[in-house]
Amino acid sequence: MAVQAPEVDKLSLNEESVAKAPTKGSAAQGTAGDEDAENEESDEDDDQGVAEGAVATGDKKKRKRKPKKKKKKGVAKVQSNPPRVPLSTLFPNSQYPEGDIVEYKDDNAYRTTNEEKRHLDRMNNDFLSDYRQAAEIHRQVRQYAQKELIKPGRSLTEIAEGIEDSVRALTGHMGLEEGDSLVAGMGFPTGLNINHCAAHYSPNAGNKMVLQHGDVMKVDFGVHVNGRIVDSAFTVAFDPVYDNLLEAVKDATNTGIREAGIDVRMSDIGAAIQEAMESYEVELNGTTYPVKAIRNLNGHTIGHYLIHGGSTGKSVPIVKGGDQTKMEEGETYAIETFGSTGKGYVRDDMEVSHYARVPDAPNVPLRLSSAKNLLNVITKNFGTLPFCRRYLDRLGQDKYLLGLNNLVSSGLVDAYPPLVDVKGSYTAQFEHTILLRPNVKEVITRGDDY
């Protein structure tokens, strides 16, 4: 998701405090190997005892006693299709796969001993575990979506609900009881942004849109565990004519990740991203289009229960000329880039689906009882996490639009309308969440797909 951020949550991310998790996508299986070794030793002892007994009896026929079969413990369960096995079942020891560990470039590769100690003192042991659990859920769900859900002829509603139902199942929190969604679940509603629409479009109730073979669709959704949000997005196109567009944006995002680090200026990251992206061209129907970075969309910090990091949050530009603000140790960032064959500039358009309660909003008297009741529902079920209209529908809310609009106009809830470039253009997006740990940066949402 691309917007400004609330307050940055600076818990330490020291690499030494969390044991290395098993390989991505597989649960820890160490205990099974140890038990097999013990079984082999006990079997050898049994066989030796049988042999000695046979010698002692002389004429008695030797009989080899069959070893008892013991059940192996610790063997990983396999994820179902569609994904419905909670991740905690697949990883019973809570050792979730770590992300892609990247060394810092040059001047910020070394952190002093005192700094490391300070971060160890402030370390929250659950911090990395929550992030890694959320990231592994994102990987498993998007893998399922790419293989099974996202196909021409499928409705956007079917795709969105398939993704969201899978996320909720893997977190073990379906979000139908009050406050359940605040424990774990969707960290950002599923955006299914087609062609010239770059961001913030999710189907509302009654939506009849169907994915077509010639479409370019951005799939953007977030997962959270205990308020630790991972935000990641990818683009799908079935026609290879769009390959260069997708490659340009993927290259730009990876460039941003490579350049990011402690004490790095946002302006330098933006310049590197733009240079990478705008070195590509796309040929459509005999016309060559330069790929343009969408200059008014940015990456952002991520805070605790805050997709945009808080009132003191930072933005990561994707074009040159940004401010001189620096990244800092302990921060979490969504590095996302958007490319377009159009103007490279987006504006608000179409029906709103995305909303979020404003953190630390002033006390505003509400005249409409429907607005008061709805604000209570939003606060108890989503807090400051973004939500969409379908989430209110599944909680049994109806006829809430008047109250919702009143909350927006009162400044208590933010509306995030879809963002579009010119009609006829095509846009693409890739996004990862990174953690700026003291000695390394961890691309927490990295997978085999992107």
From Swiss-Prot:
Catalysis performed (reactions): Release of N-terminal amino acids, preferentially methionine, from peptides and arylamides
Ranges of compositional bias, category Basic residues: 60-75
Cofactor: Co(2+); Zn(2+); Mn(2+); Fe(2+)
Family the UniProt entry places it in: Belongs to the peptidase M24A family. Methionine aminopeptidase eukaryotic type 2 subfamily.
Main location group: cytoplasm
GO cellular component labels: cytoplasm
UniProt: a divalent metal cation 2 binding residues: 231, 300, 336, 431
Alphabetical list of PROSITE patterns matching this protein: MAP_2
Protein name (database record): Methionine aminopeptidase 2
Gene Ontology biological process: proteolysis
Key words of the record: Aminopeptidase, Cytoplasm, Hydrolase, Metal-binding, Protease
Sites where the protein binds substrate: 200, 308
Record InterPro entries: Creatinase/aminopeptidase-like, Met_Aminopeptidase_Type2, Pept_M24, Pept_M24_MAP, Pept_M24A_MAP2, Pept_M24A_MAP2_BS, WH-like_DNA-bd_sf, WH_DNA-bd_sf
Superkingdom of this protein's organism: Eukaryota
UniProt subcellular location: Cytoplasm
Function (record text): Cotranslationally removes the N-terminal methionine from nascent proteins. The N-terminal methionine is often cleaved when the second residue in the primary sequence is small and uncharged (Met-Ala-, Cys, Gly, Pro, Ser, Thr, or Val).
Keyword Cytoplasm: yes
UniProt GO molecular function: initiator methionyl aminopeptidase activity; metal ion binding; metalloaminopeptidase activity
The keyword Protease belongs to this UniProt entry's keyword annotation: yes
Sites where the protein binds a divalent metal cation 1: 220, 231, 431
Spans annotated as Disordered: 1-99
Acidic residues composition-biased segments: 33-49
Cofactor: binding details: Binds 2 divalent metal cations per subunit. Has a high-affinity and a low affinity metal-binding site. The true nature of the physiological cofactor is under debate. The enzyme is active with cobalt, zinc, manganese or divalent iron ions. Most likely, methionine aminopeptidases function as mononuclear Fe(2+)-metalloproteases under physiological conditions, and the catalytically relevant metal-binding site has been assigned to the histidine-containing high-affinity site.
EC code: 3.4.11.18
